[in-house]
Amino acid sequence: MPLAWAAPLDPQELKDYSNDWAAELTATSDTLVTSTFRLPSDAIAAGLEIDSQSATATGGVVFFDVNVADQDSTDWDDPTGTIFRIPHQITTTGGRRLEVSIFLTVMQK
């Protein structure tokens, strides 16, 4: 089941979002090795970018922004925003590869 980040991203912002896998890792007595967020093609076409990303002890943190050329696009003016499905994959020391999709809304605030 996809998750959703509660706070939308304004196209003018550089903003961090995180996802935590602590419950899954604890249940399997495993530890995180890598964390990777990926952008789908529709997000890339709209100008969404990953500025940086990093792994934490139990998940990942990603910073999103919109490239300067697309920040003033009228696509962001929809009052409900534009929603993108962002995959987040981790690998563990136990050899597991886990993935979840998280919805990110981009809209003018």
Provide a role label for each language-model segment:
Residues 41-61:
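Low-complexity "stalk/linker" and mucin-like segments enriched in Ser/Thr/Pro/Ala/Gly
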Residues 56-72:
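Aromatic sugar-binding surface patches on proteins
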